[in-house]
Regions:
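Transmembrane-helix motifs of polytopic, lipid-linked glycan transferases
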Residues: 54-75, 113, 117
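Short hydrophobic alpha-helices at membrane interfaces in multi-pass membrane enzymes
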Residues: 117-138, 169-173, 177, 253
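Short helix- or helix-capping micro-motifs
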Residues: 84-89, 137, 141, 155
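Membrane-proximal, lumen/periplasm-facing interface regions of secretory-pathway glyco-
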Residues: 6, 298-362, 372-375, 379
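Transmembrane-lumen/periplasm boundary regions of multi-pass, lipid-linked membrane glycan transferases
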Residues: 148-245, 317
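Short acidic/glycine- and proline-prone juxtamembrane loop motifs at membrane-interface regions
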Residues: 93, 99-106
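Membrane-interface transmembrane helices that cradle and orient dolichyl/undecaprenyl
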Residues: 72, 114-130, 236-243
Length: 379
């Protein structure tokens, strides 16, 4: 929050603010939760950067807490829980998501919360927790459709891992019903608008998907976790796979299934799977705990390396540098560059519009290049 007022609105935020002024049951590119929270911010704070960004900041904090709690469910002690929380807090994608009010921060939290519930059920066998899982999944799908993919992948993973009994019971079915209830408004809106999201996804797949996207996707995954801790999530994937618990292995299956799906068929951006690294880091922290305990200095060195690599990430993903000096980070993180220059852009457009003769101005139509430009003008 200390940096929330620096630079300006991100183009996604400009779009969400406009969506908040015209609330609907859903939208072409995402469900209603993000615009709804933007609407709450408008009512409470007006058009305010800190007021809009308080929600993703809170979501990021809760995701860090969830990372530590997931490690506890996997059997980790305080050291593993601390490492999991630190690993989550230093994820570049979470640092960036905490600063921009779009769907990403809430998506990270929802996935982490559902993984926490699944990990707990896998450890305790208490199926009543599926009710909480359904609520989490429902809120997640109200934010972003990716939660549907994650939930389905978990079910497939459970079946592949021999966990049919754990997902075929009345508590799971009740939880699934809760999740579906949250999805009904979105489905109703999509049906009324010729399934616009599916059409958009197909267009993205044609533009960015297929085999040509695999290389970019694989390399991009290396940047989801701070570089010094990248090997920890790999250890976590191995830990889950060898755990012997069907639901824990299902979480590993979900990662693998979605990795392939997003890489090959959806033209997905590299951060679409970022939320999975929260639970993989938590599992990895548990997996390497004995190794860290053998030599106390190892944890200190690991945290020092994480601090150094995170410092570099902070310069790239957060508005720390003067706005005039962010050009060198733009290729790595164009999102930060998209928070600069909107006020000048609007003044330029306004000046041109006002320079028109009154009769021409009355019928003039302004065409923009993207939703960010449109949102800036409408704001």
């Amino acid at each position: 929050m200390a940096l929330s007022a620096r630079y300006g609105f991100d183009r996604d935020e400009l779009y969400f603010l406009d969506g908040a002024r015209h609330l609907q049951a859903s939208y072409v590119d995402q469900p209603v939760l993000g615009p709804l929270l933007a609407w709450v911010s408008l009512k409470l704070f007006g058009v305010s950067l800190p007021g809009l960004r308080v929600w993703p900041a809170l979501a990021a904090w809760a995701t860090v807490v969830a990372g530590g709690l997931i490690a506890r469910e996997f059997g980790g002690g305080k050291r593993a829980q601390l490492l999991a929380a630190i690993g989550t807090a230093t994820m570049p994608v979470l640092l960036g998501a905490a600063h921009v009010a779009n769907t990403t921060a809430y998506e990270l939290l929802a996935w982490a919360a559902l993984a926490l519930v699944v990990a707990r059920i896998g450890r305790t066998g208490d199926f009543r927790w599926w009710l909480a899982g359904g609520l989490v999944a429902g809120l997640g799908v109200a934010d972003d459709h990716s939660m549907s993919f994650f939930a389905i992948a978990l079910v497939i993973g459970a079946l592949l891992s021999g966990g049919r009994r754990m997902i075929w019971n009345r508590w799971f079915l009740a939880g699934a019903a809760i999740a579906v209830a949250f999805e009904v408004p979105d489905l109703w809106w999509q049906a009324q608008h010729q399934w616009a999201t599916i059409a958009m996804t197909r267009a993205l797949n044609q533009e960015n998907g297929g085999l040509a996207n695999i290389g970019t996707w694989v390399v991009g995954q290396l940047g989801m976790v701070t570089l010094a801790l990248a090997w920890v999530w790999v250890a976590g994937l191995r830990f889950l796979w060898r755990s012997g618990r069907p639901l824990w292995r299902a979480i590993a299956w979900a990662y693998g299934l979605l990795f392939v799906l997003f890489a090959v068929t959806t033209g997905a951006k590299t951060y679409y799977l970022a939320a999975a690294y929260v639970y993989l880091l938590a599992a990895g922290a548990v997996a390497i705990d004995a190794w860290l305990q053998a030599r106390p200095g190892r944890l200190r060195h690991l945290l020092l390396a994480a601090a150094l690599t995170t410092a570099v990430a902070v310069l790239i993903v957060l508005p720390v540098l003067p706005a005039a000096d962010i050009g060198w980070t733009y290729k790595t993180n164009p999102t930060l560059g998209e928070t600069v220059g909107w006020s000048q852009f609007v003044r330029t457009v306004d000046g041109v519009w006002k320079s028109l003769p009154p009769r021409q101005r009355a019928s003039a139509v302004i065409f923009t290049g993207d939703y960010g430009e449109a949102g800036a003008i409408r704001s």
